[in-house]
Amino acid sequence: MRKTALSGMPKSPLNISGGSPHWRHFDGLQPYAPLVQSMQEHAAAIRAEGAAEAVWLLQHEAVYTGGTSARDADLLAPGDIPALRNGRGGQWTFHGPGQRIAYVMLDIAARGHDVRALVHGLESWVIASLADCGVAGHRRDGLPGIWVQTGNSPSGMDKIAAIGIRISRWVSWHGLAINLDPELAAFDAIVPCGVRDGGVTSLAALGVQISMPQLDQRLQARFHDFF
């Protein structure tokens, strides 16, 4: 797959500072509930105390999470993996080893109160970062996340990244998940994001050999193109 050139891409209207945010990398697999509690507390501190905007990069222990639109019927057979509802936007997804989570805590009030622009910026950030890995990512009208053309599902498109955010007092939290090399069979236990005509893929399944630190470098390098 050829790398897509993105030079000259216009800045997002959300871009307000070359120095923000603070980046934090978590080592090891993180339990879901305590990490989300810490994220919620930091998001609240951004609004109440002027804490720094932040992007947290991590991997979770295996867990299914359901957003505000998640239906019980789409949780098919979770087995021994915990299934938790979390209040973000979206439906069911899987988090686990081999998946890069980016939790994005930004002051949306300082960025025009534009939630739609935030989501578009997150999508564009993922697409640009994937392009730097030699993968062409796409949006699908009316459907969340970033998709790649594989021909392996009824739609011909498989999801490689999920996006789900929550806004509290005009501060974003939650964020996105990029499949580097997770256990893709884990997605068979749910209807991922409620979409039945698309599969799930990963960078590894597409033949891309890249480490998690190398993916992180691409994410950090592209962030200020859009925020």
Where are the regions a protein language model picked out?
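C-terminal accessory segment of soluble enzyme catalytic cores
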Residues: 2-3, 147, 166, 177-227
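Glycine-rich phosphate/pyrophosphate-binding beta-alpha loops
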Residues: 169-173
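N-terminal lobe of the biotin/lipoate ligase/transferase fold
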Residues: 1-155, 160, 189, 209
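A translation/RNA-centric and nucleic-acid-associated enzymatic feature enriched
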Residues: 161, 174
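Preference for bulky hydrophobic residues occupying beta-strand positions
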Residues: 102-104, 163-165, 178
